[in-house]
């Protein structure tokens, strides 16, 4: 990564700009450029790619993305202290780094993209990571504006994202993520790699949108999954009673025994129940 050798070490950048991590912003800075390069390569190929990065901080991952050939990086940062450090990187890569000072939770990147498909690559602030992911998974229309996500989460959250039926971590997030994407944990990163070190191991997850997920209404799917996993130890015939449809009818439409529990139902089963929930609503309005 000789292309960034003339930039200061990240520890020096943090010291110069007084970038002590703010707990309120969920910040844990990854300083090892070998690890940031590994994350960037996981989103490859990057040549000619447009990348959206959330929470770049001092810019370690930003530098890796640019050094590995990303044509355009849109860096969304909510900490005003980091902006000067990012501008230094922008000066080294003229016309390739666009810095957006805003809150990622309310930011719509699509006007910045036009018709270009992007990749989302980020060491996400832990306190908003799940919120952001659910927003991206809820994108309409589908397929979405991004072609891939390579994201870092706490290991526990990563396990929930990739979990499938009969796994302890399986829940609402796993249903939504695996309905719309192919998911995989790529590798773990030790707490010691961060400043300050978090209390938990982190994991890098890749999510690739499925071009044609099994058809159903997303909101209905979320509603069924929320009801089922809200009382995950109860049978479906009990846990689904909060829905505006007969639980037995929903289960029957999916070919599922209503005495089963949510954790044993595959994503396809939730999709089938969501379709039946939509059908029952339509029946009630005709």
Curated annotation (Swiss-Prot):
Annotated compartments: Cytoplasm
Pfam families per record: RrnaAD
Catalysed reactions, as listed in the record: adenosine(1518)/adenosine(1519) in 16S rRNA + 4 S-adenosyl-L-methionine = N(6)-dimethyladenosine(1518)/N(6)-dimethyladenosine(1519) in 16S rRNA + 4 S-adenosyl-L-homocysteine + 4 H(+)
The keyword Transcription appears for this protein: no
GO molecular-function terms, A-Z: 16S rRNA (adenine(1518)-N(6)/adenine(1519)-N(6))-dimethyltransferase activity; RNA binding
Keywords associated with the record: Cytoplasm, Methyltransferase, RNA-binding, rRNA processing, S-adenosyl-L-methionine, Transferase
Function: Specifically dimethylates two adjacent adenosines (A1518 and A1519) in the loop of a conserved hairpin near the 3'-end of 16S rRNA in the 30S particle. May play a critical role in biogenesis of 30S subunits.
NCBIfam families: ksgA (TIGR00755)
The protein, known as: Ribosomal RNA small subunit methyltransferase A
Protein species of origin: Bradyrhizobium sp. (strain ORS 278)
Organism classification: Bacteria, Pseudomonadati, Pseudomonadota, Alphaproteobacteria, Hyphomicrobiales
The encoding gene: rsmA
């Amino acid at each position: 990564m000789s292309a960034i050798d003339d930039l200061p070490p990240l520890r020096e950048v943090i010291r110069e700009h007084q970038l002590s991590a703010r707990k309120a912003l969920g910040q844990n800075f990854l300083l090892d450029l070998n690890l940031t390069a590994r994350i960037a390569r996981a989103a490859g190929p990057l040549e000619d790619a447009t990348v959206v990065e959330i929470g770049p901080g001092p810019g370690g991952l930003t530098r890796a993305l640019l050094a590995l050939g990303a044509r355009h990086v849109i860096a969304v940062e909510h900490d005003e202290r980091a902006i000067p450090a990012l501008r230094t990187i922008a000066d080294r890569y003229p016309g390739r780094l666009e810095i957006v000072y805003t809150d990622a939770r309310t930011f719509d990147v699509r006007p910045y993209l036009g018709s270009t498909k992007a990749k989302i690559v980020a060491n996400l602030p832990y306190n908003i990571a799940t919120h952001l992911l659910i927003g991206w998974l809820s994108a309409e229309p589908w397929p979405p504006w991004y072609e891939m996500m390579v994201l870092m989460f706490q290991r526990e959250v990563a396990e929930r994202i990739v979990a499938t039926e009969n796994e302890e971590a399986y829940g609402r997030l796993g249903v939504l993520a695996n309905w719309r994407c192919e998911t995989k944990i790529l590798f773990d990163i030790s707490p010691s790699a961060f400043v300050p070190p978090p209390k938990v191991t982190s994991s890098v997850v890749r999510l690739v949108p499925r071009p044609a997920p099994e058809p159903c209404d997303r909101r209905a799917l979320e509603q069924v999954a929320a009801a089922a996993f809200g009382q995950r130890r109860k049978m479906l015939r009990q846990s689904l009673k909060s829905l505006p449809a007969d639980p037995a009818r929903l289960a029957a439409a999916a070919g599922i025994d209503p005495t089963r529990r949510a954790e044993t139902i595959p994503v396809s089963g939730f999709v089938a129940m969501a379709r039946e929930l939509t059908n029952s609503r339509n029946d009630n309005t005709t």
